[in-house]
């Protein structure tokens, strides 16, 4: 059961990163900065935790919630920076993405190793993010398999399914795909290409950033070096997983488990 739990935790991180990258790529952008975005998500969570703890807060659920809010904020900011550079200034997407990945890894490691931010294992603060459904113990093996996981796992599943529905079943999704596949035609049809690309990149970054904080929540033996390597690897695996799942968010759920299984076995 411990092996399966490890797979679920890794799959959660990958699923957030993959879903975020799919949204970005649907708008016509290959964001190689996903590892950096995940680093900023993790860093933002640590910042939120420290601010709340330094203010004397001791409510475990509030600590976790604030950490997630800060992770979203940091990820959105770095996503906006990437959007500005690649959409408005038209800089090379690959170079910009790699620069953000390098910058994110450096900021994360420097902030934690220098002692500016003391990142504590967030999972210790709230059982709600380790076991979203406390009643799972009464369901035996069925409960252990399906209901014994942290809330972020279920959030990742919901986000992936919702993304698939929005992309394929709504006017917004149709416009977004049009922007990515043929921006000139989309612009001629009256679709604001710049706005859609900005929104897709920022929203995708926010979702990917949750993958960074998910790793921190689920890390049983947290250290700066191990987290640095794990988050970086998860970011690149997420980008590869987008191609493996053929840019389909719902299929990425299965793909995340496959990649997680192989990663855990390795």
Region spans (language model):
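Alpha-helical transmembrane segments and their helix-start/interface "positive-inside/aromatic belt" motifs
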Residues: 88-102, 194-197, 202
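Single transmembrane alpha-helix segments in multi-pass membrane proteins
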Residues: 3-56, 68, 73-94, 241-248
